[in-house]
Amino acid sequence: MKTHRFSRIRRFRFNLPQRIAAGLLFLFLAQGMWITSRQKLSDNDYQYARCGREMWESPGAVAGYFTSCGNIHDGVLAYRLAGLPLSVNLLVERGFDVFRKPEDRVVQVGATPTGAVLRTLSTWELRHQLTHILLLLRLPFLGAGALLGAGLWWVTRRLYGNLGGYTALALYCFSPAVLSACVTPNPEILASLAVYGGIYTCIGVAHAMQGPRRKWRPRIVLLTAIFGVAVTSHLIALPLVALIGLGFMLWVAEERRGQVFPVVAIAAGGSIVFALVCYGFSANAMGFLFRAQNVLLNFSAEPALRFFSSFANAGVTVATAAALVLYCGVRRSRYFGNTAPLLCALLLFPSMLTGVAGSPWLWALPFLLTFIGGVFADACEGPKSRWAMAAAGSLLLLQAVLCLRSLPELL
């Protein structure tokens, strides 16, 4: 009897581990909502809203330029995501205005007595007519932060078990640096999601290549999409994730190393198509993406010193020091699952973009938390597991308290 193919799909389970992870992500989103509810619209918000809306509603509105902000040469996906909720909300309100009395219409400016729109309404004109503009601007980035947290938990739980997953996710959800990146329109949280997801998807593809070919395709499609997010967040993120991922794939796929290069090349080529779509199939506008200064990279200890010297990150700092001591002193902690994220963190933390604004140290943070989760999980399974669990719980509580204490500073 032939089995229906949908019956072979792994069933999603929402048991206690998933509920705990969902609770932590809920606390993460609650902190983001609290910050957002107390913020005010800034010039940066207006720029992302204006340019993002133009990409959806009227690209090329200014002759010779992709948007009135000029030709976006880096981070086009952030503009797209910032403008999408506003454009959708405006479209919905215009639809409802058809059934409203003229004096009750939400979108008042630029409409004739017959309801025809004469011109595109600016974000400044809409600031009092569309509710929750500030929240709509931040929803995509809060969503990206929650998705990165879910991916972090999924990776660490599969590698290290429940304790490793809880440790990494708790430190992530109470990280002021991550919250700060999620409560303002910017490409950094998107790049962090792409770099972390891309490298671990590369490792997943390499493992799948040991099995039948039918398991390759969905992972390669996912890898292509993640590479697309990388190149449209920061151009430099694509070669970084491709090269690091390629190195790990060659490490893992011992018997199929000859097929690793075509897989990475296909995913990278597909990401360029994704970027072309984000630029509205405008080759001229996309040409500004490939500028030399977009891929200039330098190295300095300043980003790491600034992060670890912050009092709000004291819990992560102490956890990092403890994890490094255990990694160097305990043989069982030195294996691929712990070494890979440590190498990524050591490479990305001192990296600095010199041609464009960027924060590669933020891209390194999920790898650092993965490393901490793995080493702590090993310690909790050792001979002094009770002491290790008590120490880990104390550090998580410390980081949570410091994060909540620092929330007003993120406004």
What are the residue ranges of the model-derived segments?
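Short helix- or helix-capping micro-motifs
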Residues: 26-28, 168-173, 200, 227-231
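Hydrophobic, aromatic-rich transmembrane alpha-helices
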Residues: 147, 152, 249-252, 313-342, ...
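Membrane-interface transmembrane helices that cradle and orient dolichyl/undecaprenyl
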Residues: 157-159, 198-220, 230, 333, ...
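Transmembrane-helix signature of polytopic, membrane-embedded enzymes
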Residues: 18-22, 102-124, 128, 152-174, ...
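Short acidic/glycine- and proline-prone juxtamembrane loop motifs at membrane-interface regions
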Residues: 42-43, 177-191, 357-361
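Interfacial juxtamembrane loops and adjacent helix segments
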Residues: 57-140
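Perimembrane helix-loop-helix junctions
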Residues: 4, 200-210, 227, 239-272, ...
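Membrane-lumen/periplasm interface segments of specific transmembrane helices
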Residues: 262-298, 317-318, 400-410
